[in-house]
């Protein structure tokens, strides 16, 4: 089957923004005007086609990125709608990794909001060219020009203004297209499908001329010939200017800024035109880099059907009808349904069952996918997010660069309400963890509890909610906990004899063990220094086993012991009464006695915290970290933001995300990873003991 749409006519784009700026509504309108939806879905009615999970329709927010294909001006546009809530940045990060360009939507009333900054930085990290759409021009307090200023101040970007609004708030009727130098007015009765060109209104003529001159001046920087023509007093042609703007957008020299009101159906068609005119096709961006499987040799995969197949799995979704779906961006080559492919990260062969082209939540079955496509594979068993899929021929094996996923920062215990729920919960959690790499599941050995970890309170709340709805699991959810540890601070030697005589063969074992502090991070070390056979070799493993079984419960508060050394120096045995079990019991008792006298201490997990904050809130952020027993180690500048690195005890980090958001009006963000265990100060240790005893 031949290619139906040439590669240069592909656009793989994401629509990203702060929560509530109108991303999903904008996507809905795009689908409506490109003919994919026959009826417009509204977010506030809970019928938007891109928001297809129940929780999304209820909460009016987008959690997962749904991928959709639409057509406009004979171009194929693959759109990924991404969530704007801070707890779901992982979804945005995944989408940006596989996109070629993005549309950033701003709320014209709020301007550049905190999550817009976060998303913008993520797009910078992946080098994604973008265009800006200033939405909600019909709302009270809408201000297009302030929004443009904020793009400069907060994002450090260079805006290229392409539109000026005509009328504001409820009087918003259309826009001035500066490049074509005309006014575009929408007809309300046609649901925004019809609009017409008119002369620019008299009160805007001067302003439009001024902004148009700026537009041309910025655009011609991209082309020497156009620049000479412009400096010679001649205006370059429309086509030349368009080519200059395209070049500048793709090289990220500037960002075109458009305006409209998606909800009122105005400005969506010019936005679609801009996607096609200015955002890159797969062939316009650098080839994706990877390494040849099993080597360190770097290779590039080009967007062409002629190279062997290579793609990246960027999302796993459970579909109620098809089962597990793996969303894949095909970078090169052709892949057919029913064929075998290699997962080079998991080192497994996979068979592509069915191949689907997704439209939000309906699907179309296809027989093959080619370079540039974003498709869903059904039937993959071992593939998870971030894996490379490629042609199984040995010479074609490649590993594309993986995505980085943040470590979870909050954990809660969950326990099933009944035995039946227990089995279902295991399956549900495994499925959810496969879909979402920022969600982890562990079993706590000490308490036997299942602990789930995620990116924030909303994140875990929604996952527990999905567990209840999709998998029908009833569970109780606990409060967040800290995993403390214990160790010793000085050496102590114990001589302990275990004797038990009850007629017949008894039990006898004598051990002399020296306990001493170990290296940080060394865990538990056991050494046998018995000379002359006072403890026969076959009994020594019993001594080690006894200590190992006792060290799970420390003497202070029953937390596991770490970083100590036990040396067996001497002992005695009895020909008849000694056994491995007797030595195990003796060493266990010696451990309890010795550790209690070796200066036991409580340890707590210390987290390495990195806070990225605008300069204005620097003092407050540092003051707050100090009040949490934190130590600031380093301060750095990143763009127009400050980066603070500090060590803070995990126990003092609960609820930090909310404090930080309110302290910085939501503009600061943080990440936190475990660094090491450190001694708990005496006053805090006493508090913990009292709490556990009480």
From Swiss-Prot:
GO molecular-function term, one example from the UniProt record: translation elongation factor activity
Keyword Cytoplasm among record annotations: yes
Domain tr-type G residue range list: 8-283
Keyword annotations from UniProtKB, A to Z: Cytoplasm, Elongation factor, GTP-binding, Nucleotide-binding, Protein biosynthesis
Protein residues bound to GTP: 17-24, 81-85, 135-138
PANTHER family: RIBOSOME-RELEASING FACTOR 2, MITOCHONDRIAL (PTHR43261:SF1), TRANSLATION ELONGATION FACTOR G-RELATED (PTHR43261)
Role played: Catalyzes the GTP-dependent ribosomal translocation step during translation elongation. During this step, the ribosome changes from the pre-translocational (PRE) to the post-translocational (POST) state as the newly formed A-site-bound peptidyl-tRNA and P-site-bound deacylated tRNA move to the P and E sites, respectively. Catalyzes the coordinated movement of the two tRNA molecules, the mRNA and conformational changes in the ribosome.
Protein name: Elongation factor G
Lineage: Bacteria, Pseudomonadati, Pseudomonadota, Alphaproteobacteria, Rhodospirillales
Gene: fusA
